Swiss-Prot record:
This is Probable transcriptional regulatory protein VSAL_II0141. PANTHER family: TRANSLATIONAL ACTIVATOR OF CYTOCHROME C OXIDASE 1. Keywords: Cytoplasm, DNA-binding, Transcription, Transcription regulation. The keyword Cytoplasm applies. GO terms for cellular component: cytosol. It comes from Aliivibrio salmonicida (strain LFI1238) (Vibrio salmonicida (strain LFI1238)). Gene3D superfamilies: 1.10.10.200, 3.30.70.980. It is found in: Cytoplasm. GO terms for biological process: regulation of DNA-templated transcription. The lineage of its organism: Bacteria, Pseudomonadati, Pseudomonadota, Gammaproteobacteria, Vibrionales.
Length: 240
């Protein structure tokens, strides 16, 4: 990857309103995952991973259970995945993933985020080719070579592995997610994994400074206010 993986998640919600947005996004995603793959986490590995991720982000159990019960009961909303790509202020590449029950509304909402900040929304494929769709695992450690050897012994396809400041980051094709997860658990039963997700890793990070950085942050804030937006991926590196 040429550099250490940077987790670009927003800081944990500090206000009640922001927490509600986080809960809503997880609730919608868990509902769709359970509806499409079944409500039993032991039979639906994607759901099992999503529940684990939600708990790490401090989503209350009753929110998770409610979403699964809703999916198990049938009916309810029929959400569809929608993806929008383009270039954010300063020219950074961006991918916006949504879950929506009204595609026209969601497109208009996302489009306004681009328009209001001078960003440019494009057609499918506009910016996604500038990212690698990867499974990423991050945990404390000092011997990345031993981890790599252990994964290779389990016949795991590893794209890259990095060590920086006592943190090991493993990259693998997105299709290898559960294979990596299983192999790490088998080789290191007591390992605490801080990050385990499928994400879009930028191939070439872009430094955004000055006025462009301010506009870029406004762009992210506007997207965060859109109820249908689930994830935003970008290659921007902002000044501290």
């Amino acid at each position: 990857m040429g550099r250490s993986f940077e987790v670009r998640k927003s800081s944990m919600a500090k206000t009640q309103g922001a927490k509600i947005k986080v809960y809503s996004k997880y609730g919608k995603e868990i509902y769709m995952c359970a509806k499409n793959g079944g409500p039993d986490p032991d039979m639906n590995l994607s759901l099992k991973h999503l529940i684990s991720k939600a708990k790490k982000d401090q989503v209350p159990t009753h929110i998770i259970d409610k979403a699964i019960d809703k999916a198990n009961g049938g009916g309810g909303e029929d959400y569809q995945h929608a993806r929008y790509e383009g270039f954010a202020p300063g020219g950074a590449s961006v991918i916006v993933d949504c879950l929506t029950d009204n595609g026209n509304r969601t497109f208009q909402d996302v489009r306004q985020c681009f328009v209001k900040t001078g960003a440019k929304i494009g057609s499918p494929g506009t910016s996604s080719h500038m990212f690698d769709h990867q499974a990423v695992f991050q945990f404390k450690g000092e011997d990345e070579e031993a981890v790599l050897e252990a994964l290779m012994m389990q016949d795991v396809d590893v794209t890259d592995i990095e060590l920086e400041d006592g943190v090991i980051t493993v990259f693998a094709p997105n299709t290898e997610f559960f294979k990596v997860k299983t192999a790490l658990a088998a080789e290191y039963p007591d390992l605490v994994v801080d990050v385990e997700e499928i994400t879009f890793v930028p191939q070439n990070p872009m430094e955004i400074t000055g006025e462009d950085a301010e506009k870029f942050q406004k762009f992210l804030d506007l997207l965060d206010d859109c109820d249908d937006v689930q994830q935003v991926y970008h290659n921007a590196e902002l000044e501290d």
